[in-house]
């Protein structure tokens, strides 16, 4: 039940550090020609990854934590991704990813507090980064530029990737948060859905951040293993 408090300034710094990592460790055609897949949808790593991609104008696709190997593989194949970002240390998942990596010829970027050689970004060190790295300026895009892809469940056949544009999506995110939920920079919001679903994109991340609100992001396994955690959070807000 660890708590991590991140200010807007600290979040920007972490995003810039991750952008620097991406630009220094991957070729441009790997980063910009195909969408990036982001697994591990319920933690800070996915938040940083999503915002880094958005800032660089890289179309990204968040994959729900509990998807099977087959479900992950078909989504990676459909978007033709060359990079998969994950924060999972699960041994079973790691073996599955190795198979997907080999079959689809993708590179895997792993966030972890582990010290093993498969880890790309050590979170113990990464989250403690205090030094201010050069600020990466936001790039101006056409409003209809693809921002991210989110897949349907696939329960009625092959999953379908729903493309969300930069301008239209951000306008509706900010509008609904402001006008329907009365969210402002004084608001603390808890959206229990993770980024594997549209509510996690809109009401845990992009909408609240666009209005300067404080958003609480839950690591999903914590809630599933101990439902009292949700009650504890609500009583301590």
Region locations from a protein language model:
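Conserved AMP-binding/adenylate-forming
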Residues: 21-67, 190-195
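Flexible, low-complexity linker/hinge segments
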Residues: 116-145, 170-172
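Conserved AMP-binding/adenylation subdomain of ANL enzymes
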Residues: 170-188, 198-237
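AMP-dependent adenylate-forming
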Residues: 1-7, 115-119
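Conserved AMP-binding A3 loop
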Residues: 4-9, 140, 147-171
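Structural core segment of the AMP-binding/adenylate-forming
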Residues: 51, 55-127
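Conserved structural elements of the adenylate-forming
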Residues: 12-20, 162-182
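ATP-dependent adenylate-forming carboxylate-activation enzymes
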Residues: 40-42, 58-76, 88-93, 194, ...
């Amino acid at each position: 039940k660890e708590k991590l408090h991140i200010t807007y300034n600290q979040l920007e710094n972490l995003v810039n550090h991750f952008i620097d990592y991406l630009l220094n460790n991957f070729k441009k055609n790997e980063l910009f020609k195909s969408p990036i897949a982001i697994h591990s949808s319920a933690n800070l790593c996915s938040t940083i990854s999503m915002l880094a991609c958005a800032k660089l104008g890289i179309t990204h696709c968040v994959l729900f934590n509990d998807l099977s190997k087959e479900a992950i593989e078909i989504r990676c194949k459909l978007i033709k991704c060359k990079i998969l970002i994950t924060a999972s240390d699960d041994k079973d998942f790691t073996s599955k990813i190795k198979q997907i990596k080999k079959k689809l010829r993708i590179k895997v970027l792993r966030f972890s507090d582990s010290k093993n050689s498969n880890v790309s970004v050590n979170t113990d060190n990464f989250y403690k980064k205090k030094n201010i790295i050069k600020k990466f300026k936001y790039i101006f895009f056409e409003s209809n530029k693809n921002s991210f892809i989110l897949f349907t469940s696939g329960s009625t056949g092959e999953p379908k990737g729903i493309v969300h544009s930069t301008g239209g999506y951000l306008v509706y995110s900010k509008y609904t948060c402001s006008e329907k939920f009365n969210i402002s920079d004084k608001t603390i919001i808890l959206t229990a859905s993770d980024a594997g679903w549209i509510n996690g994109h809109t009401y845990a991340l992009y909408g609240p951040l666009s209005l300067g609100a404080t958003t609480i992001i839950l690591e999903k396994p914590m809630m599933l293993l101990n439902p009292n955690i949700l009650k504890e959070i609500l009583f301590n807000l």
